[in-house]
């Protein structure tokens, strides 16, 4: 049985707990949240993981097999780095955090010191395996276009530049490289960062972001070209009802990763 501690109990964390509540190979031992959120977390996890303890941090003598981060960028510094130092493998959802200078290097260093591994999850996007494989032979271009309903861009710089509620046609709110996209839109940066880390890097991955009132889905389009040939991928992801900035596929990617760790056969 795989013993798991999870950082975060928001829309992603609760979705993961619900989908794995009947899996005999996965046991959630702890859910890690800020102190002010502990009571709410206890209530949220009760139907899915009633035996999991709610705590503010992973103890130094924790016997967990795996830490799963579902809490946002700050959780990498606060929880993932210490867990790696303790020798605990980690799964990371908030891949966009690695666009910040030095974060990727610190994660790798902590994992090496603890003889652990950190796995960056694909989240809302597919074909990461193909892109990473294509990089071995040489990539010429990786172009990502992200299209979301205007409401998904609330509380971002787009809200200062555009009247999102008044948009009547697809509108480009950003075009540039993945590093700049991640800096300006950190809560929407995970897909661009994941593609960059699998492919050409943050500086050389081209990103276009659109607010589109004609769609009610999060639409991701990836084009890659290189020595292998080329591919295009379009994904139309339904957002989580509890968080329109997040694709439901992100939850499913966590569930799949845990299953691959826990089950006898993985794919």
From Swiss-Prot:
Belongs to the L-aspartate dehydrogenase family. It catalyses: L-aspartate + NADP(+) + H2O = oxaloacetate + NH4(+) + NADPH + H(+); L-aspartate + NAD(+) + H2O = oxaloacetate + NH4(+) + NADH + H(+). The iminoaspartate product is unstable in aqueous solution and can decompose to oxaloacetate and ammonia. The gene is nadX. GO terms for molecular function: aspartate dehydrogenase activity; NAD binding; NADP binding; oxidoreductase activity, acting on the CH-NH2 group of donors, NAD or NADP as acceptor. The keyword NAD applies. It comes from the Bacteria. GO terms for biological process: NAD biosynthetic process. Specifically catalyzes the NAD or NADP-dependent dehydrogenation of L-aspartate to iminoaspartate. This is L-aspartate dehydrogenase. NAD(+) binds at residues 124, 190. Gene3D superfamilies: Dihydrodipicolinate Reductase, domain 2, NAD(P)-binding Rossmann-like Domain. The lineage of its organism: Bacteria, Pseudomonadati, Pseudomonadota, Betaproteobacteria, Burkholderiales. Its EC number is 1.4.1.21.
């Amino acid at each position: 049985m795989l013993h798991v501690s999870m950082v975060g109990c928001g829309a992603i964390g609760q979705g993961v707990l619900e989908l794995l509540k009947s899996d005999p190979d996965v046991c959630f031992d702890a859910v890690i949240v800020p102190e002010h959120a502990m009571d709410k977390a206890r209530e949220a996890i009760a139907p899915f993981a009633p035996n999991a303890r709610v705590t503010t941090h992973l103890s130094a003598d924790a016997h967990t097999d795996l830490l799963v981060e579902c809490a946002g960028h700050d959780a990498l510094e606060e929880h993932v780095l210490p867990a790696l130092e303790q020798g605990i493998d980690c799964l990371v959802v908030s891949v966009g955090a690695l666009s910040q200078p030095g974060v990727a290097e610190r994660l790798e260093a902590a994992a090496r010191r603890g003889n652990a591994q950190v796995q960056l999850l694909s989240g809302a996007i597919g074909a990461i395996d193909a892109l990473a494989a294509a990089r071995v032979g040489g990539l010429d271009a990786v172009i990502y276009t992200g299209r979301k309903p205007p409401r998904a861009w609330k509380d971002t710089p787009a809200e200062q530049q555009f009247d999102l509620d008044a948009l009547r046609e697809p509108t480009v709110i950003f075009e540039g490289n993945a590093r700049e996209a991640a800096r300006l839109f950190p809560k929407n940066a995970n897909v661009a960062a994941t593609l960059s880390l699998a492919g050409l890097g943050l500086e050389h991955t081209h990103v276009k972001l659109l607010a589109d009132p004609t769609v009610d889905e999060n639409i991701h389009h990836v084009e890659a070209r290189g020595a292998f040939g080329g591919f295009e991928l379009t994904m139309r992801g339904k957002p989580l009802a509890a968080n329109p900035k997040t694709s439901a596929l992100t939850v499913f990617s966590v569930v799949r990763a845990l299953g691959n760790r826990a089950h006898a056969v993985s794919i």
